[in-house]
């Protein structure tokens, strides 16, 4: 059995994952946001929704989501408003929330391009498939 080595592909994958995670957190922390707030902003970027639907989509308890939403409401990133055809009480992004969400999405795209930029479309697809398979194996 081989010893773990800093030259191994797995080591580099772990290192890249940790550095990418840190790079994705940086713009959140600079804006006074917490890890996970971006998931809320991205989900609300699709459309306003009810708190119950948002909690279910993100896999959060309603109590946990309420705490996060209170902070985002205080920072004027989200607002309470009627959503959907039934005009149910819900939550949506403010203009400021949309700008911050777009900035975070742009940052994500830049990191993705740094990773995949030199690859041709078929190579990108194959890499994505291999990483997905590896993740699936690890989840067993």
Question: Which sequence ranges carry the predicted segments?
Answer:
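N-terminal helix-turn-helix DNA-binding core of bacterial DNA-binding proteins
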Residues: 11, 22-64
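Charged, amphipathic alpha-helical coiled-coil/dimerization segments
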Residues: 70-132
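N-terminal leader segment of winged-helix/HTH proteins
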Residues: 1-31, 77, 99
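Short, locally clustered residues in the helix-turn-helix/winged-helix DNA-binding domain
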Residues: 14, 42-46, 105, 132
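C-terminal regulatory/oligomerization modules of transcriptional regulators
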Residues: 1-4, 122-140
